[in-house]
Protein backbone atom coordinates (compact mmCIF):
# COMPACT_ATOMS: atom_id res chain seq x y z
CA UNK A 1 0.00 0.00 0.00
CA UNK A 2 2.64 2.51 1.02
CA UNK A 3 4.64 1.94 -2.15
CA UNK A 4 1.61 3.13 -4.13
CA UNK A 5 0.96 6.04 -1.75
CA UNK A 6 4.59 7.13 -2.10
CA UNK A 7 3.86 7.81 -5.78
CA UNK A 8 1.02 10.14 -4.76
CA UNK A 9 3.16 12.08 -2.28
CA UNK A 10 5.87 12.43 -4.95
CA UNK A 11 3.36 13.96 -7.37
CA UNK A 12 2.06 16.27 -4.63
CA UNK A 13 5.60 17.51 -4.07
CA UNK A 14 5.98 18.12 -7.80
CA UNK A 15 2.82 20.16 -8.32
CA UNK A 16 2.55 22.08 -5.04
CA UNK A 17 3.85 25.64 -4.98
CA UNK A 18 6.49 26.87 -2.56
CA UNK A 19 4.82 27.54 0.78
CA UNK A 20 1.82 25.31 0.02
CA UNK A 21 0.52 22.70 2.45
CA UNK A 22 -0.13 18.98 2.21
CA UNK A 23 -2.79 17.62 4.60
CA UNK A 24 -3.20 13.84 4.86
CA UNK A 25 -5.98 12.06 6.75
CA UNK A 26 -4.83 8.55 7.67
CA UNK A 27 -5.69 5.99 10.31
CA UNK A 28 -3.34 3.44 11.81
CA UNK A 29 -4.14 -0.24 11.27
CA UNK A 30 -4.30 -3.37 13.41
CA UNK A 31 -3.67 -6.76 11.86
CA UNK A 32 -3.24 -10.34 13.00
CA UNK A 33 -0.40 -11.92 11.02
CA UNK A 34 0.91 -15.40 11.75
CA UNK A 35 -1.23 -15.42 14.88
CA UNK A 36 0.26 -12.20 16.26
CA UNK A 37 -1.94 -9.12 16.75
CA UNK A 38 -0.07 -5.84 16.21
CA UNK A 39 -0.42 -2.14 15.43
CA UNK A 40 0.91 -0.80 12.13
CA UNK A 41 1.68 2.93 12.31
CA UNK A 42 0.67 4.28 8.92
CA UNK A 43 1.22 7.84 10.11
CA UNK A 44 4.89 7.20 10.91
CA UNK A 45 5.52 5.59 7.52
CA UNK A 46 3.90 8.51 5.67
CA UNK A 47 5.82 11.12 7.68
CA UNK A 48 9.09 9.40 6.80
CA UNK A 49 8.18 9.30 3.10
CA UNK A 50 7.12 12.96 2.94
CA UNK A 51 10.14 14.21 4.87
CA UNK A 52 12.38 12.26 2.50
CA UNK A 53 10.80 14.19 -0.39
CA UNK A 54 11.59 17.49 1.33
CA UNK A 55 8.31 18.33 3.08
CA UNK A 56 8.48 19.90 6.54
CA UNK A 57 6.23 18.14 9.05
CA UNK A 58 4.34 20.68 11.15
CA UNK A 59 2.31 19.94 14.32
CA UNK A 60 -0.25 17.26 13.46
CA UNK A 61 -3.88 16.86 14.49
CA UNK A 62 -5.58 13.90 16.16
CA UNK A 63 -9.13 13.48 14.85
CA UNK A 64 -11.13 11.82 17.62
CA UNK A 65 -14.06 10.22 15.82
CA UNK A 66 -17.04 10.25 18.14
CA UNK A 67 -19.06 7.05 17.89
CA UNK A 68 -22.24 5.57 19.29
CA UNK A 69 -21.05 1.98 18.82
CA UNK A 70 -22.30 -0.13 21.77
CA UNK A 71 -19.42 -2.61 21.60
CA UNK A 72 -15.91 -1.21 21.27
CA UNK A 73 -13.95 -4.02 22.91
CA UNK A 74 -11.02 -5.76 21.21
CA UNK A 75 -9.42 -8.95 22.46
CA UNK A 76 -10.39 -10.74 25.67
CA UNK A 77 -13.21 -8.45 26.79
CA UNK A 78 -13.16 -8.01 30.58
CA UNK A 79 -10.13 -10.24 31.21
CA UNK A 80 -6.65 -8.73 31.70
CA UNK A 81 -3.52 -9.36 29.64
CA UNK A 82 -5.43 -10.12 26.46
CA UNK A 83 -7.52 -7.03 25.71
CA UNK A 84 -6.45 -4.30 23.32
CA UNK A 85 -7.03 -0.57 23.17
CA UNK A 86 -9.61 0.37 20.55
CA UNK A 87 -8.44 2.90 17.97
CA UNK A 88 -10.94 5.77 17.96
CA UNK A 89 -8.83 8.39 16.27
CA UNK A 90 -7.21 9.11 12.94
CA UNK A 91 -4.32 11.38 12.07
CA UNK A 92 -4.36 14.60 10.09
CA UNK A 93 -0.75 15.04 9.06
CA UNK A 94 0.31 18.58 8.16
CA UNK A 95 3.25 19.27 5.84
CA UNK A 96 4.56 22.39 4.14
CA UNK A 97 6.63 22.57 0.98
CA UNK A 98 9.53 24.93 1.54
CA UNK A 99 9.43 28.16 3.50
CA UNK A 100 6.42 30.19 4.56
CA UNK A 101 4.27 31.69 1.82
CA UNK A 102 5.28 35.26 1.00
CA UNK A 103 2.92 38.19 0.44
CA UNK A 104 4.74 40.92 -1.49
CA UNK A 105 1.93 42.55 -3.49
CA UNK A 106 -0.81 44.65 -1.91
CA UNK A 107 -3.44 42.54 -3.69
CA UNK A 108 -1.99 39.37 -2.16
CA UNK A 109 -2.12 40.89 1.30
CA UNK A 110 -5.72 42.03 0.74
CA UNK A 111 -6.82 38.53 -0.31
CA UNK A 112 -5.15 37.05 2.74
CA UNK A 113 -7.02 39.41 5.06
CA UNK A 114 -10.27 38.76 3.19
CA UNK A 115 -9.70 35.03 3.88
CA UNK A 116 -9.18 35.38 7.62
CA UNK A 117 -11.16 33.44 10.22
CA UNK A 118 -12.74 34.38 13.52
CA UNK A 119 -10.69 34.46 16.72
CA UNK A 120 -12.81 31.80 18.38
CA UNK A 121 -12.55 29.57 15.28
CA UNK A 122 -8.78 29.74 15.48
CA UNK A 123 -8.88 28.52 19.09
CA UNK A 124 -10.79 25.40 17.99
CA UNK A 125 -9.29 24.76 14.57
CA UNK A 126 -5.67 25.05 15.66
CA UNK A 127 -6.06 22.70 18.60
CA UNK A 128 -4.24 19.39 18.11
CA UNK A 129 -7.34 17.34 19.00
CA UNK A 130 -10.52 17.55 16.91
CA UNK A 131 -13.77 15.89 17.95
CA UNK A 132 -15.87 15.58 14.80
CA UNK A 133 -18.45 12.89 14.19
CA UNK A 134 -17.38 10.45 11.49
CA UNK A 135 -19.34 9.57 8.36
CA UNK A 136 -20.09 6.13 6.93
CA UNK A 137 -21.83 5.99 3.57
CA UNK A 138 -23.13 2.97 1.71
CA UNK A 139 -22.93 3.31 -2.07
CA UNK A 140 -25.47 1.24 -3.97
CA UNK A 141 -24.70 2.76 -7.34
CA UNK A 142 -20.96 2.07 -7.33
CA UNK A 143 -20.43 -1.69 -7.86
CA UNK A 144 -16.68 -1.41 -7.31
CA UNK A 145 -17.08 -0.30 -3.69
CA UNK A 146 -19.26 -1.73 -0.97
CA UNK A 147 -18.56 1.19 1.30
CA UNK A 148 -17.12 4.67 0.97
CA UNK A 149 -15.40 5.89 4.12
CA UNK A 150 -16.00 9.58 3.47
CA UNK A 151 -14.83 12.03 6.06
CA UNK A 152 -17.28 14.67 7.28
CA UNK A 153 -17.49 17.94 5.37
CA UNK A 154 -16.30 19.94 8.37
CA UNK A 155 -12.88 18.30 8.23
CA UNK A 156 -11.76 19.56 4.77
CA UNK A 157 -13.69 22.80 5.36
CA UNK A 158 -11.50 23.59 8.37
CA UNK A 159 -8.26 22.58 6.66
CA UNK A 160 -9.00 24.57 3.51
CA UNK A 161 -9.72 27.71 5.52
CA UNK A 162 -6.66 27.15 7.72
CA UNK A 163 -4.08 26.48 5.03
CA UNK A 164 -5.23 28.30 1.89
CA UNK A 165 -6.89 31.55 0.90
CA UNK A 166 -9.71 32.56 -1.41
CA UNK A 167 -8.97 31.91 -5.07
CA UNK A 168 -6.36 29.23 -4.37
CA UNK A 169 -6.51 25.81 -6.04
CA UNK A 170 -7.07 22.86 -3.70
CA UNK A 171 -5.78 19.49 -4.94
CA UNK A 172 -7.48 16.26 -3.87
CA UNK A 173 -5.68 13.13 -5.18
CA UNK A 174 -8.36 10.86 -3.65
CA UNK A 175 -11.56 12.58 -4.79
CA UNK A 176 -14.06 9.85 -3.94
CA UNK A 177 -17.49 11.49 -3.79
CA UNK A 178 -16.21 15.07 -3.87
CA UNK A 179 -16.37 16.09 -0.20
CA UNK A 180 -13.19 18.18 -0.55
CA UNK A 181 -14.48 19.77 -3.77
CA UNK A 182 -17.68 20.81 -1.98
CA UNK A 183 -15.68 22.24 0.93
CA UNK A 184 -13.58 24.22 -1.56
CA UNK A 185 -16.71 25.64 -3.21
CA UNK A 186 -18.08 26.69 0.17
CA UNK A 187 -14.76 28.37 0.97
CA UNK A 188 -14.49 30.29 -2.34
CA UNK A 189 -11.54 28.19 -3.51
CA UNK A 190 -10.96 26.37 -6.78
CA UNK A 191 -10.28 22.65 -6.69
CA UNK A 192 -8.88 19.81 -8.78
CA UNK A 193 -9.61 16.19 -7.90
CA UNK A 194 -8.45 12.81 -9.17
CA UNK A 195 -10.22 9.48 -8.73
CA UNK A 196 -9.02 6.17 -10.22
CA UNK A 197 -12.37 4.41 -9.71
CA UNK A 198 -14.16 5.23 -12.98
CA UNK A 199 -17.39 3.71 -11.70
CA UNK A 200 -17.68 6.62 -9.26
CA UNK A 201 -17.83 9.20 -12.06
CA UNK A 202 -21.64 9.09 -12.64
CA UNK A 203 -22.31 9.35 -8.91
CA UNK A 204 -19.77 12.14 -8.48
CA UNK A 205 -21.35 14.03 -11.37
CA UNK A 206 -24.79 13.64 -9.80
CA UNK A 207 -23.59 14.83 -6.39
CA UNK A 208 -21.75 17.94 -7.60
CA UNK A 209 -24.41 18.80 -10.21
CA UNK A 210 -27.22 18.70 -7.67
CA UNK A 211 -25.69 20.60 -4.76
CA UNK A 212 -28.45 22.04 -2.60
CA UNK A 213 -27.51 25.72 -2.86
CA UNK A 214 -29.86 26.75 -0.06
CA UNK A 215 -28.44 24.14 2.29
CA UNK A 216 -24.88 24.96 1.26
CA UNK A 217 -25.40 28.66 1.88
CA UNK A 218 -26.85 27.83 5.27
CA UNK A 219 -23.35 26.76 6.34
CA UNK A 220 -22.06 30.24 5.62
CA UNK A 221 -24.89 31.81 7.58
CA UNK A 222 -24.51 29.29 10.39
CA UNK A 223 -20.83 30.19 10.72
CA UNK A 224 -21.77 33.85 10.97
CA UNK A 225 -24.54 33.10 13.47
CA UNK A 226 -22.16 31.15 15.71
CA UNK A 227 -19.90 34.17 15.78
CA UNK A 228 -22.77 36.46 16.77
CA UNK A 229 -23.62 34.11 19.64
CA UNK A 230 -19.97 34.17 20.71
CA UNK A 231 -19.97 37.98 20.72
CA UNK A 232 -23.25 38.13 22.65
CA UNK A 233 -21.86 35.76 25.26
CA UNK A 234 -18.75 37.88 25.77
CA UNK A 235 -20.82 41.05 26.09
CA UNK A 236 -23.00 39.40 28.74
CA UNK A 237 -19.84 38.55 30.67
CA UNK A 238 -18.66 42.17 30.37
CA UNK A 239 -15.71 41.09 28.25
CA UNK A 240 -14.35 43.34 25.54
CA UNK A 241 -14.93 42.82 21.81
CA UNK A 242 -12.78 45.62 20.50
CA UNK A 243 -13.08 45.85 16.71
CA UNK A 244 -15.78 46.26 14.03
CA UNK A 245 -16.08 44.38 10.75
CA UNK A 246 -18.10 46.68 8.50
CA UNK A 247 -18.25 44.12 5.67
CA UNK A 248 -20.36 41.64 7.64
CA UNK A 249 -21.61 44.18 10.20
CA UNK A 250 -20.48 42.64 13.45
CA UNK A 251 -17.95 43.00 16.25
CA UNK A 252 -14.72 40.98 16.09
CA UNK A 253 -11.92 40.29 18.52
CA UNK A 254 -8.86 41.32 16.50
CA UNK A 255 -7.89 43.78 13.79
CA UNK A 256 -6.98 40.86 11.51
CA UNK A 257 -10.69 39.91 11.34
CA UNK A 258 -11.94 43.32 10.19
CA UNK A 259 -11.56 42.53 6.46
CA UNK A 260 -13.14 39.06 6.59
CA UNK A 261 -16.00 38.70 4.08
CA UNK A 262 -18.47 35.99 3.08
CA UNK A 263 -20.19 35.43 -0.27
CA UNK A 264 -23.13 33.14 -0.93
CA UNK A 265 -23.06 30.55 -3.70
CA UNK A 266 -25.24 31.49 -6.66
CA UNK A 267 -24.91 28.29 -8.69
CA UNK A 268 -22.60 25.40 -9.55
CA UNK A 269 -22.54 24.40 -13.22
CA UNK A 270 -21.10 21.41 -15.09
CA UNK A 271 -19.15 23.10 -17.91
CA UNK A 272 -17.23 20.23 -19.54
CA UNK A 273 -17.79 16.50 -19.75
CA UNK A 274 -15.54 14.94 -22.36
CA UNK A 275 -13.10 12.87 -20.33
CA UNK A 276 -13.35 14.92 -17.18
CA UNK A 277 -15.90 16.69 -15.02
CA UNK A 278 -15.44 20.44 -14.83
CA UNK A 279 -17.57 22.60 -12.57
CA UNK A 280 -17.84 26.36 -12.30
CA UNK A 281 -19.01 28.09 -9.13
CA UNK A 282 -20.59 31.54 -9.11
CA UNK A 283 -21.01 33.67 -6.00
CA UNK A 284 -23.40 36.44 -5.05
CA UNK A 285 -20.83 39.17 -4.66
CA UNK A 286 -21.59 42.21 -2.57
CA UNK A 287 -24.52 40.62 -0.74
CA UNK A 288 -24.40 41.24 2.98
CA UNK A 289 -24.50 38.21 5.22
CA UNK A 290 -27.43 39.48 7.26
CA UNK A 291 -29.51 40.14 4.13
CA UNK A 292 -30.07 36.39 3.75
CA UNK A 293 -33.80 35.53 3.54
CA UNK A 294 -35.06 33.66 6.59
CA UNK A 295 -36.20 30.64 4.56
CA UNK A 296 -32.62 30.03 3.43
CA UNK A 297 -31.25 29.74 6.95
CA UNK A 298 -30.37 26.41 8.49
CA UNK A 299 -27.38 24.31 9.36
CA UNK A 300 -25.12 21.96 7.42
CA UNK A 301 -22.94 20.79 10.32
CA UNK A 302 -25.11 18.42 12.33
Model-identified regions with their sequence ranges:
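Active-site-adjacent helix-turn-beta-strand microarchitecture at beta-sheet edges
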Residues: 108-119
Amino acid sequence: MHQELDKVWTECWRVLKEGAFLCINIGDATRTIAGEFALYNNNTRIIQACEKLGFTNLPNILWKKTTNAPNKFMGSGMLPCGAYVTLEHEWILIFRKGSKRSYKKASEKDTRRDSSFFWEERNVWFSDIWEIKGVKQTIDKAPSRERNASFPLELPYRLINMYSQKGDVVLDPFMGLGTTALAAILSERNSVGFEIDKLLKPLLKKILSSIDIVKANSLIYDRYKRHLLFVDDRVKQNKEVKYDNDHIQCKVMTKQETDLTFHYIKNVELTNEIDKLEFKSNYLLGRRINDMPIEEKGTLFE
